[in-house]
């Protein structure tokens, strides 16, 4: 039976690969997409998500989400993804539009209609998820688990210690991590290992229309290079859903620093139990890289 999922995203070039996998992996049933400000503004992430859905002729409802973090000024990652968020490919015009409700209410309504608890996947800042949990706490019982791309048990990529998705809205992340829902965290500890090799990247233009499109986007992606390999951060959250055997997880207490002058946005991952607090997150710490690369090749071959 296919696993029903809702995907919260901020496309973003590596988001595009994750969305492809969520749509075409035969094990998954992508029922709702929502957008959030992150890599670029929410207007741009929404436009990009709609372009991708149209490209794949995917009839999946999409709702636009939060334009700004809960309390902070917005930041972005245009230096990594380009000013549009998905530079490099000319998508055809379409007349699709988002639902006439904000993302957190769209998630709430879809959860309440679902016949069974649903897995949420968040591969951008956690603003929409925090709004859902704070404004609609009755929804917790309908969430099977939350799988995120975000955080790190070690070094950051936005500050010395903070990963971008968490640092973009630390207060939202703190709310989510305190919520009591089951969380799987695919952070930089694994996503920095999730590299598509130059040899594989070179095959994409001949793979199918998706491969050609992604190859064009990748030429503008700055998380690695076409010559050294590209890191597929967001794709790890989708990969865990389908192939959890590729990941090594450890239950840990995780908190989000919101006050530090230099450490705001850091995920404090208590790997050794120093704080004597109960684990609230399953933290991915290692990845079978060869197995991941093989799975990516298999799922993108289906993305026609």
Swiss-Prot record:
E.C. no: 3.2.-.-
GO molecular function terms listed in the Swiss-Prot or TrEMBL record: purine nucleosidase activity; uridine nucleosidase activity
Keyword Endoplasmic reticulum: no
A matching Pfam family: IU_nuc_hydro
This protein's UniProt keywords: Glycosidase, Hydrolase
Metal-binding is among the record's keywords: no
InterPro entries: I/U_nuclsd_hydro_CS, Inosine/uridine_hydrolase_dom, IUNH, Nucleosid_hydro_RihC_nonspecif, Ribo_hydro-like
EC class (word): hydrolase
Gene Ontology CC entries for this record: cytosol
Active site: 233
UniProt record, GO biological process: purine nucleobase metabolic process; purine nucleoside catabolic process; pyrimidine nucleobase metabolic process
Family: Belongs to the IUNH family. RihC subfamily.
NCBIfam families: PRK10768.1
Annotated function: Hydrolyzes both purine and pyrimidine ribonucleosides with a broad-substrate specificity.
Stated name of the protein: Non-specific ribonucleoside hydrolase RihC
The species this protein was found in: Escherichia coli (strain SMS-3-5 / SECEC)
